[in-house]
């Protein structure tokens, strides 16, 4: 039998007392009262923060949105099929955040920044809150650098600058996504990081966009955030903020970013669904009272950083879908008032074969010529006025039987200018090519050609200048000015090409 000395017992007790850890973990917990339709009502969770992440017993994560006196309304970030009434929920003391980093370039992710392209995990270099405060007044500077879209109608008349927010608005099937993807394609070699956020789209549409970007080598500098139509409303609501957080990561590292929200109407509908299920009082068109704040806090994050912060930028192109061209509906008017201009795409123009179907009359950029290089200002200054006068005259000509010679000439030139603005999808033009096109049309060099010959002549003229007069493009890209030398080169090329073209037509 082993005998234990009294001093050994006291030593053992002393050791155990020294090893005792007095740390107490307080966990804020609650109980599920009710669950369904992507919403859970929780009793307890007394000290939960607004927007805090909560974790259910079976692993589902939710966000506490409604803090009421008797219970907490939580929106689920999953289907929540395994959550049972009476099961426990614990607060995580964390606000929604996502991993960020360079490794996200070229990847397709969901609203929680998890990869969904089947290419393995992504190694993040840090974390950012999904909802961050927008830069203040002192942190910004006014927009002054152009962000070229490669679309002649936009770059010449509705210019977009780095750090601007320009709304793309129009009915369904009018080419809104095409304008956005063409802008991404045109950023190749411009050192601009692009983020494309697809909200509530068909999975096939998103796959089509990703394929286009991959084929053209644009995925190297692009991140796609996708929450398709079958995703929970919570994730569709969060997706734009996830995209903004990723773009901000690059903006605060003195880089230029472009973010496309396709589209914010679907996000507003997802938020309306969540709000009605949370029993928040409905307002106009059954949207909750804070739907304006939903979009303003998102779009205000787009900015041009001040010199102190390294002059990074985040340019936002939100897309909004209208019903039968009604721009006075609730969401369109809200987003128009938040953004720095809008590009209006018309179904009538689209059906008439004018693509991109941009209605130049009611489209506007509130930054204006500050977002254009000097060469473009010099050449395109008269273009919008000419087209506006042409549209007016065309409407009048439908009723007038006999027009004077000057009016007939103006109509002919307007038709040729409109022909020049037509562009096929995924075929962005360089600034020099746009200047060639506009200069030729504005100065009447195309008036002698048939309407059907205009496109062919311009394509051949661009090729001729590129091969025989490369100096022209050098001048535009290096000086950004349409100098006398550049003008002389262009006029000479137009004359040479016109002679050659007319000879070809006679043969």
Swiss-Prot record:
Its EC number is 7.1.2.2. Its main location: plastid. It is found in: Plastid, Chloroplast thylakoid membrane. One of its GO terms (cellular component) is proton-transporting ATP synthase complex. ATP binds at residues 170-177. SUPFAM superfamilies: C-terminal domain of alpha and beta subunits of F1 ATP synthase (SSF47917), N-terminal domain of alpha and beta subunits of F1 ATP synthase (SSF50615), P-loop containing nucleoside triphosphate hydrolases (SSF52540). It is a peripheral membrane protein. Keywords: ATP synthesis, ATP-binding, CF(1), Chloroplast, Hydrogen ion transport, Ion transport, Membrane, Nucleotide-binding, Plastid, Thylakoid, Translocase, Transport. The record marks 363 as: Required for activity. The keyword ATP-binding applies. It is an enzyme of class 7 (translocase). PANTHER family: ATP SYNTHASE SUBUNIT ALPHA, MITOCHONDRIAL. Produces ATP from ADP in the presence of a proton gradient across the membrane. The alpha chain is a regulatory subunit. F-type ATPases have 2 components, CF(1) - the catalytic core - and CF(0) - the membrane proton channel. CF(1) has five subunits: alpha(3), beta(3), gamma(1), delta(1), epsilon(1). CF(0) has four main subunits: a, b, b' and c. Belongs to the ATPase alpha/beta chains family. This is ATP synthase subunit alpha, chloroplastic. It comes from Ipomoea purpurea. The gene is atpA.
């Amino acid at each position: 039998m082993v005998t234990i000395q009294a001093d050994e017992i006291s030593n053992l007790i002393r050791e155990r007392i020294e090893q005792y850890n007095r740390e107490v973990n307080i966990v804020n917990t609650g109980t599920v009262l009710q669950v369904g339709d992507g919403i859970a009502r929780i009793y307890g969770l007394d000290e939960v923060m607004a927007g805090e992440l909560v974790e259910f017993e079976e692993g589902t994560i939710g966000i506490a949105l409604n803090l009421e006196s008797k219970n907490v309304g939580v929106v689920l970030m999953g289907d929540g099929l395994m959550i049972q009434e009476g099961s426990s929920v614990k607060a995580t003391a964390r606000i929604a955040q996502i991993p960020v980093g360079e490794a996200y370039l070229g990847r397709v992710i969901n609203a929680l920044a998890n990869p969904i392209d089947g290419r393995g995990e992504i190694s993040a270099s840090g974390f950012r809150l999904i909802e961050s405060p927008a830069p203040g007044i002192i942190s910004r500077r006014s927009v002054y650098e152009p962000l070229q879209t490669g679309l002649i109608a936009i770059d010449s008349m509705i210019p977009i600058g780095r750090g601007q927010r320009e709304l793309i608005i129009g009915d369904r099937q009018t080419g809104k996504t095409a304008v956005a993807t063409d802008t991404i394609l045109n950023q190749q070699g411009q050192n601009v990081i692009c983020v494309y956020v697809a909200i509530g789209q068909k999975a096939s549409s998103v796959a089509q966009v990703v394929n286009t970007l991959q084929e053209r080598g644009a995925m190297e500098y692009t991140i796609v955030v996708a929450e398709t139509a079958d995703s929970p409303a919570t994730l569709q609501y969060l997706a734009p903020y996830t995209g903004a957080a990723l773009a901000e990561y690059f903006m605060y590292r003195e880089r230029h970013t472009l973010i496309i929200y396709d589209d914010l109407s679907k996000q507003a509908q997802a938020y309306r669904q969540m709000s009605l299920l949370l029993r928040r009082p409905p307002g106009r068109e059954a949207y909750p009272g804070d739907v304006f704040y939903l979009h303003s806090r998102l779009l205000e994050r787009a900015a041009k950083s001040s010199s102190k912060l390294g002059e990074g930028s985040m340019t936002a192109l939100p897309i909004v879908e209208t019903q039968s061209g009604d721009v006075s509906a609730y969401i369109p008017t809200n987003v128009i008032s938040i953004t720095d201009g809008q590009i209006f795409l018309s179904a009538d123009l689209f059906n008439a074969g004018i693509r991109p179907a941009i209605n130049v009359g009611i489209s506007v950029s509130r930054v204006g010529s500050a977002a254009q290089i000097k060469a473009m200002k010099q050449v395109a200054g008269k273009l919008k006025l000419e087209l506006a006068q042409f549209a007016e005259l065309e409407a009048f000509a439908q009723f007038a039987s006999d027009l004077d010679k000057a009016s007939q000439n103006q109509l002919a030139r307007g038709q040729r200018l409109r022909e020049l603005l037509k562009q096929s999808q995924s075929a962005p033009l360089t600034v020099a090519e746009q200047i060639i096109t506009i200069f030729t049309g504005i100065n009447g060099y195309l008036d002698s050609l048939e309407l059907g010959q205009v496109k062919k002549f311009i394509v051949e003229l661009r090729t001729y200048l590129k091969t025989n007069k490369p100096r022209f493009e050098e001048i535009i890209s290096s000086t950004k000015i349409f100098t006398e030398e550049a003008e002389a080169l262009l006029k000479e090329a137009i004359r040479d090409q016109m002679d050659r073209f007319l000879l070809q037509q006679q043969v």
